[in-house]
Each structure stands twice: as structure tokens, then as C-alpha cells.
């Protein structure tokens, strides 16, 4: 987890320094709220526009494998691209935020939290739960359903409204 934490901190600090809005999601967010699940990937939702592509590539090119075409395509299609840290061989998946009303609200609700001395933006527990239910339905994933159960057990004050 130390290498993963080092890469997470590096990515979060670079995004913040570049004023690129983001939120951590997926298994890393689950780890913040509930029982951790083994994963080597870091999932980060980012708010990007076409003109941000070159800046994103330049932010990470020194320490990460990054494909400029994949970044441009992901932004254009509101899809996903990844970067891989050269030394730690850890993958960071960047999910370009969708422009649906729910995804915009989800992003607006993100929370600033401190993780090992660094302030980072994190999806709320409620939005993580909803996303995992969607992923479970789309992929017929028992792992996602187990994550939902773990989250519901661990977070006593979920807002059901």
C-alpha cells in the first residue's frame, strides 16, 4: 500500500497544483470508508475539457507512461484513459466526468479529506455506493455487491435521502 499511497499522493498533488478538479473513487475510496479490497489500480474522476489534454500529458509524462492520443480520445468521448508509474508499475485510471445532471451533482458533493497528510478530493460514501450498484448491475459483479455490503456495514450514518 505504501507505493500505491505514494503514487496517489503524487497524482493528487499534481492535479491540485494544475487546478484540475478531480475526485478519488473506486477501491481507494472504499478503503477510506470501509474494509479494503486488494487492488493495484487507482480510480480518479476528472473534469477535463479538450484544451486540457496537452496539459494533462505534460503533468505526468516525466514519471508515468501516458498516451496523448488516449487522453484526447477519452476527453472527446467522456471516457477513460490511464497512466502507469514507471518505477512502481502502478496504474491510475482517469475517468472523464460525464455531463449528466447526476454525475455533475456527484462531483459537486465530493469531499476534501486528509489522507496521510495530504488533502485530497474523495467521492462521498453515498455516491460511491450508488456507483458500485450501477457497476454491479452492468457487469453482473459479485465483487461490487460485496463492496456495497461492506460500505453499508462500515458507514453507520449513510444519508438515504
Where are these regions (language model features)?
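Compositionally biased terminal segments of proteins
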Residues: 1-161
